């Protein structure tokens, strides 16, 4: 079984991902969605957590061999990023969504040298907006951001466009396509549910029952 399928299986098993194609969720953006993901749940399961962090290390070493510092997005990317940095014996920093309004006004916590090659860790990619904002902040501080890595992606076309426009390489451990097919194979959804989930991937903005 591939890493993407292993992680998809674990996300379903521990209920980090909920699939309700016939009772959709409403995202903050207003989009009706048949899927909801909370990857923070993975931190409570040591075997899943280890699978994820080892997967990150393998992917980062393969795709970004020159990395010099790992950074996590606040807050979801912090625990994963810290574990990855420890496993890779690299410095760690984290990036706030906005600068502090007191003290030194830092947006990046930790020490990042100008030109230091950075990979930014996020737990979930929807449109990619939050991680790309974090990357922009890191670049303003002088970091050389060579890529981003995430546990899971919804594979939204808008995310692909946003990362391409920003010139940022993204790698993920698992994805929507792998997960919905595995979910159907293992009985989480039926064939009709799978068809609804496939339709969502084709046109998220206009998807409805």
Curated annotation (Swiss-Prot):
UniProt cofactor(s): Mg(2+)
Q: What EC identifiers does the entry list?
A: 2.4.2.10
**What is the annotated quaternary arrangement, including any partners?**
Homodimer.
Q: What is this protein called?
A: Orotate phosphoribosyltransferase
Q: Which family does it belong to?
A: Belongs to the purine/pyrimidine phosphoribosyltransferase family. PyrE subfamily.
Q: Which Pfam families match?
A: Pribosyltran
The processes (GO biological process) annotated in the record are: 'de novo' UMP biosynthetic process; pyrimidine nucleobase biosynthetic process
Against PANTHER family, the record matches this protein to: OROTATE PHOSPHORIBOSYLTRANSFERASE (PTHR19278), URIDINE 5'-MONOPHOSPHATE SYNTHASE (PTHR19278:SF9)
Per UniProt, 5-phospho-alpha-D-ribose 1-diphosphate binds at: 96, 100, 102, 122-130
For this protein, the record's InterPro entries field holds: OPRT, Or_phspho_trans_dom, PRibTrfase_dom, PRTase-like
Alphabetically, the GO molecular function entries are: magnesium ion binding; orotate phosphoribosyltransferase activity
Q: What does this protein do?
A: Catalyzes the transfer of a ribosyl phosphate group from 5-phosphoribose 1-diphosphate to orotate, leading to the formation of orotidine monophosphate (OMP).
